[in-house]
């Protein structure tokens, strides 16, 4: 009997996760077959190259940007799927075993919901869609349907196989600390977008790198962990581990702590998510334990980086509060990149929007509730940004 290949859809094919996923698939063509790709459209030439190398028909390519779509359609000799719902439409019209959602931001929510509706496994790198959708998203998922791609949550899933749910005492989420580890809040007022784009251990896209610098990314991951593993936020510790070798740890009720350790590369969690629960041989080089290593751990400086504690509060509130946290951050982060606000003001904006969230945030019974909450959060964030920008 021949080996059955898994049919994979890649959403966000031109980004860091998407390109690495395509590398993993190319190295394991006996295991995986790409049946469609989606991207925003900022790199049309790369989309064309990917589609041609994969032998995809035009109708198995989706791009959000209309101008880029026209260029790509011409090159591929047929009309591709285009528009803001392009990725969602691709999911709905393409049969796949696994959909890798590596889109950026809460725009990935529609594709996440479409994947869950289709019955395909969701390899989720787009944490924002889970954070924004919260319990509304998890309620749509079958048991085991969502497979985390984030290295931290992939590590948690691996460690959890060492015991039962009742035996888990605490989850330990590790953070590199970002490029400004050890800096005071006062010093960070001088941070430039260029400095924030330089991560010490990981190669990521611009927004993820900035979110790592503010530790908003770690806040999103804390919220994500409560949803994926149905865990109370107070049972999750966050520790700074500058080497980014240990990706997460689980402490069990008997006092044992199981850690997942590997070099800082996304190829291992990507490969594991694509073929879960099986491991893909040689997904990445292993650590050499015959060489000397020094691993350090230190507490998060909550005064300099309040994003994690803010996320813990948000996770406890549940409902659409996480959607407010994410949407306000997306607007504030973009404002910083455009030079409209200072680096510490990113989290300040998120905090202030959350303080007024009781007026518009609540429990989501429909996707429109999430979208309405996001829209209000963005409007409030931008109003605050406009006030701050006039004082710079």
UniProtKB/Swiss-Prot annotation:
Pathway noted in the entry: Isoprenoid biosynthesis; isopentenyl diphosphate biosynthesis via DXP pathway; isopentenyl diphosphate from 1-deoxy-D-xylulose 5-phosphate: step 1/6
Chain residues that bind Mn(2+): 150, 152, 221
Purpose: Catalyzes the NADPH-dependent rearrangement and reduction of 1-deoxy-D-xylulose-5-phosphate (DXP) to 2-C-methyl-D-erythritol 4-phosphate (MEP).
Cofactor: Mg(2+); Mn(2+)
HAMAP family: DXP_reductoisom (MF_00183)
Name of the coding gene: dxr
Family recorded in the similarity comment: Belongs to the DXR family.
Pfam (any one): DXP_reductoisom
Protein name: 1-deoxy-D-xylulose 5-phosphate reductoisomerase
EC number: 1.1.1.267
């Amino acid at each position: 009997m021949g080996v059955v290949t898994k049919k994979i859809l890649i959403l966000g094919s031109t980004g860091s996760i998407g390109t690495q996923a395509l590398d993993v698939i190319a190295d394991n063509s006996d295991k995986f077959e790409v049946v469609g790709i989606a991207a925003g459209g900022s790199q049309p030439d790369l989309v064309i190259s990917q589609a041609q190398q994969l032998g995809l028909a035009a109708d198995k390519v989706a791009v959000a940007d209309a101008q880029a779509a026209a260029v790509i359609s011409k090159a591929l000799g047929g009309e591709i799927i285009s528009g803001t719902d392009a990725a969602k439409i691709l999911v709905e019209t393409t049969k796949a075993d696994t959909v890798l959602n590596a889109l950026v931001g809460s725009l990935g929510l529609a594709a996440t919901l479409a994947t869950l509706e289709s019955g395909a496994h969701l390899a989720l790198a787009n944490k924002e869609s889970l954070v924004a959708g919260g319990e509304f998203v998890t309620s749509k998922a079958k048991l085991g349907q969502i497979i985390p791609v984030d290295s931290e949550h992939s590590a948690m899933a691996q460690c959890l196989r060492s015991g039962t749910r009742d035996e888990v005492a605490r989850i330990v989420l590790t953070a590199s600390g970002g490029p400004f580890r050890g800096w005071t809040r006062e010093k960070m007022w001088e941070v430039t977008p260029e400095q924030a784009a330089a991560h010490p251990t990981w190669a990521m896209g611009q927004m993820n790198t900035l979110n790592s610098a503010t530790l908003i990314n770690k806040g999103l991951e804390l919220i994500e962990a409560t949803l994926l593993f149905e865990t109370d936020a107070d049972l999750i510790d966050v520790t700074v581990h500058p080497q980014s070798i240990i990706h997460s740890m689980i402490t069990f009720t008997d006092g044992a702590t199981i850690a997942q350790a590997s070099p800082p590369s996304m190829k291992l969690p990507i490969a594991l998510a694509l073929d879960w629960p099986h491991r893909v041989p040689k997904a990445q080089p292993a650590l050499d334990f015959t060489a000397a290593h020094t691993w350090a751990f230190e507490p998060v400086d909550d005064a300099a980086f309040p994003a994690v504690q803010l996320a813990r509060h948000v996770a406890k509130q549940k409902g659409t509060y996480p959607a407010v946290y994410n949407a306000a951050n997306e607007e504030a982060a973009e404002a910083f990149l455009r030079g409209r606000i200072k680096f510490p003001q990113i989290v300040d904006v998120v905090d202030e929007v959350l303080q007024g969230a009781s007026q518009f945030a609540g429990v989501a019974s429909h996707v429109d509730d999430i979208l309405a909450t996001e829209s209000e959060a963005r409007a409030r964030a931008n109003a605050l940004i406009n006030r701050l920008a006039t004082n710079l």
